[in-house]
Regions:
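Sec-dependent signal peptide recognition
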Residues: 3-10
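Short, linear, compositionally biased motifs with a strong N-terminal bias
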Residues: 13-14
Length: 199
């Protein structure tokens, strides 16, 4: 006989998995929020708290994890064959590394925040954008340079011009953010209307 207490963790995991599945169309901001309405509420809350535009938040998540809550960097390989260590501790929607995530939790007094939750991830992105604005004086609306700082880190941002890959990534994020922004103009009014959510 299977004890109920033993299966509770599995029930929680599968429920969390179902709620965190990747949206069907991650190329369209309206489609994302129509499928995951609470995500719009979370992204809007981050914008109101930190000033990071919603389209920027989405573009960062799209680039970092493609909306996969369990995303991790692929493992490196020994002798090009044997799976080895991962190149960093990046995880979740925002691909935040452990050290920066712990700093975020301390500074925002959010001890229970997790990288696998969209709400916490977009709040983290908003916090990071806000700090980048304070530290590097980069406008919160400057998607290109904000992503360079996100990718390189505050300390290494000054060397971004030597990193061709970072520049390519930042340009793609800027393009994606512009696409999301234009799409949002078509559905934001409807999304801002009060909705009752039944769980």
């Amino acid at each position: 006989m299977i004890h109920f207490k033993k299966i509770i963790p599995f029930i929680i995991f599968f429920t969390f998995s179902a709620c965190s599945s990747i949206p069907k169309n991650t190329q369209n901001s309206c489609a994302i929020f129509e499928e995951r309405y609470l995500w719009y509420k979370h992204a809007k809350a981050s914008y109101e708290k930190w000033g990071a535009p919603i389209h920027l938040q989405l573009a960062f998540v799209k680039k970092e994890s493609d909306f996969n809550w369990l995303a991790k960097p692929p493992r490196t390989k020994l002798f090009k064959v044997i799976p080895f260590k991962r190149p960093s501790s990046s995880f979740g929607y925002s691909q935040a590394v452990k050290g920066t995530w712990e700093q975020y939790k301390r500074e925002t007094n959010s001890p229970l925040a997790t990288r696998a939750r969209f709400k916490d991830s977009v709040d983290f992105i908003g916090w990071y954008i806000h700090k980048t604005n304070k530290i590097l004086r980069i406008s919160k609306k400057d998607v290109y340079r904000q992503y360079l700082a996100y990718y390189k880190g505050w300390g290494d941002y000054k060397n971004y011009s030597k990193d061709k890959k970072a520049i390519i990534y930042a340009k793609s994020v800027k393009d994606m953010a512009n696409k999301y922004r234009k799409q949002l103009t078509l559905c934001k009014k409807n999304l801002d209307k009060n909705k009752y959510i039944i769980f």
